[in-house]
Amino acid sequence: PVKNFFFGNVKAHCDRIGKICDATKFSMKDVRIESCDTVMRIDNCDYASFFGFSNVTTGSSVKIEKTGGECRYLNVQTYPLVPVNYQSIRPGEVWLDTEGKPIQAHGFQVTFREGKYYWYGEDKTHTLFGTNRMFGGVRCYSSTDFYNWKDEGRIIEPATDPHSPLHHCQKLERPHILYCAKTGRYVCWLKSQSNDGHFVILEAEHFMGPYHFVRNLKPNGFAVGDFDMYADPDTGKGYVWFERPHWEQICAELSDDYTNVNG
């Protein structure tokens, strides 16, 4: 049987994609069908997962049928793919951007600047668990009312160089961006879980990037876990609080340019 088979970003003019039979694990993501009745039939699959299936002509969801053998796990998530305009926050629902796509900003931060909210976080659109494809960059959204969020694109891109600390195989999480008044630059810290825990530090002239790698950092030689950051608006001093995993919480003062710590 087929194992760990994945389709992504499929565009097709068809009545159906076909039938999947005897697959150990089968996933399809972000599928845009323009004309469809029954799109998919699945038979005797241990695990089948379908994310973002939609008919782009009508904005409606598409039809998936189970036939024959048992499917032990079936997960289907469909989205309208039409513009949305929220009047409130809807707990328990998948939050969509203004184009009708699921918001991809995990492990996020929200900041307010120049009359807009900016929500940025990990882009998991193409993350495939069970593979080495983990880091999809950092995506940013903007809003004036905190309900409706416009996709501004990725402000940090995953690297294609396998030796880069930003390569898609790296386990990078929880981006934090501070503005450093002394340098006039934006500094981004990410937590890396690859190998031992450390920070990956980037810098940019503009909040929306492009960001450039500065250094990897283990403050005072400590491995790092979850963290938070703060810049004091009165003194201009920056601080990082981080977990020494399963051991203790540590606070360190940042260097003047926010790209290191002062002991």
Can you annotate each of these PLM segments?
Residues 1, 15-22, 38-44, 60-66:
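Glycine-rich beta-solenoid repeat tracts in large extracellular/virion proteins
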Residues 2-7, 26-30, 48-53, 71-76:
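All-beta strand scaffolds that present successive hydrophobic residues in beta-strands
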Residues 10-15, 34-37, 56-61, 76-81:
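Surface-exposed loop/turn segments connecting beta-strands in extracellular beta-rich domains
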Residues 13, 26, 35, 57, ...:
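A cross-taxa feature marking solvent-exposed loop/turn segments within ectodomains of secreted
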Residues 24, 46, 207:
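A generic "binding-loop/recognition-motif" signal
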Residues 79-263:
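Carbohydrate-active catalytic/glycan-binding domains of CAZyme proteins
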